From Swiss-Prot:
It comes from the Eukaryota. Pfam families: PMG. Interacts with hair keratins. Sequence repeats lie at residues 46-55, 56-65, 66-75, 76-85, 92-101. This is Keratin-associated protein 13-3. Keywords: Keratin, Repeat. The gene is KRTAP13-3. InterPro entries: KRTAP_PMG. It comes from Homo sapiens. In the hair cortex, hair keratin intermediate filaments are embedded in an interfilamentous matrix, consisting of hair keratin-associated proteins (KRTAP), which are essential for the formation of a rigid and resistant hair shaft through their extensive disulfide bond cross-linking with abundant cysteine residues of hair keratins. The matrix proteins include the high-sulfur and high-glycine-tyrosine keratins. Transmembrane segments: none annotated. The keyword Acyltransferase does not apply. Belongs to the PMG family. Residues 46-101 are annotated as: 5 X 10 AA approximate repeats. GO terms for cellular component: cytosol; intermediate filament.
Length: 172
């Protein structure tokens, strides 16, 4: 099964009121349960769990996974897919592979509330690290480690071993 992967420049793309992006429309072939971000990459068709080269590397990731795969290939910036659904995980893994010599780093992204990013339970600079146990409000019933599907601005990737997400109102 393949998906048509949107490139960057999509305008106000809002999938189910989930997140909003700059650029043009994503189109119906955009997987509703994946969030995709890239820079300077042309669209291509990706097989789940595999990648194709079209001037840069684009990657599709399984929608039922709590992992995030981020790949950088010159001259392009990073391409990432995130699971759209909130999922409980035993661990959160973020992989950074690219020409800048980065290996693998593990971290959990910040928990997003309805209006802002929460810094509770986070490490230095507001980042939450691998296997950090968190407790959210009873209404959300997330009491263990989990990954949130969050869009990261592409040019802020290689900032630290963990990355602060870009949260929008109405995340939940």
């Amino acid at each position: 099964m393949s998906y048509n992967c949107c490139s960057r420049n999509f305008s106000s793309c809002s999938h189910g009121g989930y997140l909003h992006y700059p650029g043009s429309s994503c189109g119906s072939s955009y997987p509703s349960n994946l969030v995709y971000s890239t820079d300077l990459c042309s669209p291509s068709t990706c097989q789940l769990g595999s990648s194709l080269y079209r001037g840069c590397q684009e990657t599709c990731w399984r929608p039922n996974s709590c992992q995030t795969l981020c790949v950088e290939s010159s001259p392009c910036h990073t391409s990432c897919y995130y699971p759209r659904t909130h999922m409980l995980c035993n661990s959160c893994l973020t992989m950074h592979v690219g020409s800048r010599g980065f290996g693998s780093n593990s971290c959990c992204s910040l928990s997003c509330g309805s209006r802002s990013c929460s810094s509770l339970g986070c490490g230095s600079n507001g980042f939450r690290y691998l296997n950090y146990r968190i407790h959210t409000s009873p209404s959300q019933s997330y009491r263990s480690r989990f990954c949130h599907p969050i869009y990261f601005p592409p040019r802020r990737w290689f900032h630290s071993s963990c990355y602060q997400p870009f949260c929008r109102s109405g995340f939940y």
